From Swiss-Prot:
Expression not detected in roots, inflorescences, siliques, leaves or stems. The signal-anchor present in all the other members of the family is missing. The lineage of its organism: Eukaryota, Viridiplantae, Streptophyta, Embryophyta, Tracheophyta. It is an enzyme of class 2 (transferase). Signal peptide: none annotated. Pathway: Glycan metabolism; pectin biosynthesis. This is Putative galacturonosyltransferase 2. One of its GO terms (molecular function) is polygalacturonate 4-alpha-galacturonosyltransferase activity. It comes from Arabidopsis thaliana (Mouse-ear cress).
Length: 528
């Protein structure tokens, strides 16, 4: 083949001229205008090819890429040359499939180049073989292996001809770069969509827990009033005992927190759990712990709607949660025009953000006025060791002690609060001050961590890291040894252990404190 040249001869004869494997000479039925247009198109193609070859920026990128590739060991990829004798002897069926996938990539490159150079016959041949390869890849027939090998041979022959006719380094490189960009864009869109679905699913209550809650609610309302009282009420205000504050509307998660704490306590009789929920879950939460009391420990269940002092005139956040503007901001994310715009704001559309339960942590001294110290725990933690030493830690005049040694940033999950220092520093009033400033959500959108970081600024004392380990709800790479030596592990993140999205290797640390033989849990088919 002669590239972009003219063969001299008799002017009366048809003189073929080839460019990238495509004949652009005069045909018998060509008019002078058609021949001129064809010649112009070919000149434009050659001009574009020269531009690509002279593009310094592309040359620099390719040079850098080749330099990086020298340090990459390509031996694990093997040799996919099908015409070598050792290929059939040493390669597995999986290797043939990998070769097929490589061929598909190159076939798409040459198919595009064939169409670009107007070589429609080769373009159609490649597309036909691509369809055949795709069908073989999805096939599960018994004789699939032999047919795959035959298809690979056929495609290899077509690619060899395509390489001979169409190959030009710059054009192939740019085609591969364009394909890579397309794949990266598709991958980014898929990741956005996955993030959207993950956030959406993480905010929904699993059917099994909803079933459990409904059954417990029914049983509670059928229970006679005298049988609804918890024992050992005299321990609720005893400052010499170890008190826990747990605010939750998830009965199963709350049960794991209580069970894990009691089972790892040296003296369970000295531990008191103050559980606050809402009126919708009060019956279920009460019934569960009436049926499954935490051994010798004390437990008390309340609903925050019974706190008469907690009203919109006292609490700025309660007034804001009830406002039309807040509800509009919260619910408008459901009407996003696209997945991309919806996923950006979906994190704010979390039911707990519209629940006062999420903000009760700022009113702990008002809820428990006679206590001096209390350990606040979230419902997505598991306790693995005895926590009684936390009450003997000197907070050095600070309001709370948390796990992170950097006072400028910390997290909820487990915090020991000195309620006397809390009152002395007017923490609740400080919280109200910042909530009023954020009425229009200019400082932060929703949630309790931002106001918590501001309110407790410079009023925290660090704990040793062994007490609290974060990340089991999103980080799949946590060292098992770190998990096992931590006193409290925290499933913060979207992948909660009671959902199907939970990270499987971390779920046993949570499920070991769940009684799957309980008739209600068994009937509701949790984790089936």
């Amino acid at each position: 083949m002669t590239d972009a040249c003219c063969l001299k001869g008799n002017e009366d004869k048809m003189v073929p001229r080839f460019g990238h494997g495509t004949w652009i000479g005069k045909a018998f039925n060509d008019t002078p205008e058609m021949l001129h247009e064809r010649s112009l198109r070919q000149e434009k193609r050659l001009e574009r090819a020269n531009e690509l070859m002279n593009d310094d920026s592309l040359q620099k990128l390719e040079t850098a890429a080749m330099a990086r590739s020298r340090s990459v060991d390509s031996a694990p990829l093997g040799n996919y040359t099908i015409w070598k004798n050792e290929y059939r002897r040493g390669k597995s069926f999986e290797d043939m499939l990998r070769l097929m996938q490589d061929q598909i990539i190159m076939a798409r490159v040459y198919s595009g180049l064939a169409k670009f150079t107007n070589n429609l016959a080769l373009h159609q041949e490649i597309e036909t073989q691509l369809m055949k390869l795709a069908w073989e890849e999805e096939s599960t027939d018994i004789d699939q292996e032999q047919r795959v090998l035959d298809s690979i041979r056929d495609m290899g022959q077509i690619l060899a001809r395509a390489h001979e006719q169409l190959y030009e380094c710059k054009l192939v490189t740019n085609k591969l770069r364009a394909m890579l960009q397309t794949v990266e864009d598709e991958l980014e869109n898929e990741q956005t969509y996955i993030t959207f679905l993950t956030q959406l699913a993480s905010k929904a209550l699993p059917d099994a827990i909803h079933c459990l809650t409904m059954r417990l609610n029914l049983e509670y309302h059928l229970l006679p009033l005298p049988m609804r009282n918890f024992p050992r009420r005299e321990n609720l205000e005893n400052p010499k005992l170890y008190h826990y504050a747990l605010f939750s509307d998830n009965v199963l998660a709350a049960s794991v927190v209580v069970n894990s704490t009691v089972m790892n306590a040296q003296d369970p009789s000295r531990h008191v759990f103050h559980l606050v929920t809402d009126k919708l879950n009060f019956g279920a939460m009460s019934m569960w712990f009436l049926l499954n009391p935490p051994g010798e420990a004390t437990i008390h269940v309340q609903r925050f709607e019974d706190f008469t002092w907690l009203n919109s005139s006292y609490s700025p956040v309660l007034s804001q949660l009830e406002s039309a503007a807040m509800k509009k901001f919260y619910f408008k994310t459901a009407r996003s025009e696209s997945v991309e715009s919806g996923s950006e704001n979906l994190k704010y559309r979390y039911p707990k953000y519209m629940s006062m339960l999420n903000h009760l942590r700022f009113y702990i001294p008002r809820i428990f006025p006679k206590l001096e110290k209390i350990l606040f725990v979230d419902d997505d933690v598991v306790v693995q060791k005895d926590l009684t030493p936390l009450w003997s830690i000197d907070l050095k005049g600070k309001v709370n002690e948390n796990f992170d040694p950097k006072f400028c940033g910390w997290a909820y999950g487990m915090n020991i609060f000195d309620l006397k220092e809390w009152k002395k520093n007017n923490i609740t009033e400080t919280y109200h001050f910042w909530q009023n400033l954020n009425e229009n959500r200019t400082l932060w959108k929703l949630g309790t961590l931002p106001p918590g970081l501001i309110t407790f600024y410079n009023l925290t004392q660090p704990l040793q890291r062994k007490w609290h380990l974060l990340g089991l709800g999103y980080d799949k790479g946590i060292d098992v040894k770190k998990i096992e030596r931590s006193a409290v592990i925290h499933y913060n993140g979207h992948m909660k252990p009671w959902t199907e999205m939970g990270i499987s290797k971390y779920q046993p640390y949570w499920t070991k404190y769940t009684n799957f033989d309980h008739p209600y849990i068994f009937t509701c088919r949790l984790f089936e």
